[in-house]
Amino acid sequence: MVHLTAEEKNAITSLWGKVAIEQTGGEALGRLLIVYPWTSRFFDHFGDLSNAKAVMSNPKVLAHGAKVLVAFGDAIKNLDNLKGTFAKLSELHCDKLHVDPENFKLLGNIIVICLAEHFGKEFTIDAQVAWQKLVAGVANALAHKYH
């Protein structure tokens, strides 16, 4: 379980209200597929993922990335119950999709990178600390079924 202070929760929620879900989600998932190309095996039904341009313009990548960030929105609404919030997704990713749980950490870190890029100076060190804790908590919750 990740412990977030009131200040960290505020840092997360104050930025979250300004996040462009579709844009940031698509960018994050696209970057995951480009930077860590072995992750594309989970998305072979998405069509052309042969190069960066194809990935970043692929409508299925963009839509699924948005779906991922919507799930992060659920996490933000339930910061004190991440395992419960992600129980069904953990089961899906473990039992049916067989996703290596390390990929959750990779995607979480890429989400932080995207937020830092989009928010610039507004994404302070304190905000990064809070977001890193959140993505670690989400990755842990998604990996819960694996344990």
UniProtKB/Swiss-Prot annotation:
Molecular function GO terms recorded: haptoglobin binding; heme binding; metal ion binding; organic acid binding; oxygen binding; oxygen carrier activity; peroxidase activity
N-acetylvaline: residues carrying this PTM: V2
Modified residues (Phosphothreonine): T13
CDD domains (alphabetical): Hb-beta-like (cd08925)
Residues the record lists as S-nitrosocysteine modifications: C94
Keywords: Acetylation, Heme, Iron, Metal-binding, Oxygen transport, Phosphoprotein, S-nitrosylation, Transport
SUPFAM superfamilies, per the entry: Globin-like
Tissues of expression: Red blood cells.
Record-listed N6-acetyllysine modification sites: K60, K83, K145
Record's function text: Involved in oxygen transport from the lung to the various peripheral tissues.
Protein name: Hemoglobin subunit beta
Taxonomic source organism: Notamacropus eugenii
Record lineage: Eukaryota, Metazoa, Chordata, Craniata, Vertebrata
Gene name of this polypeptide: HBB
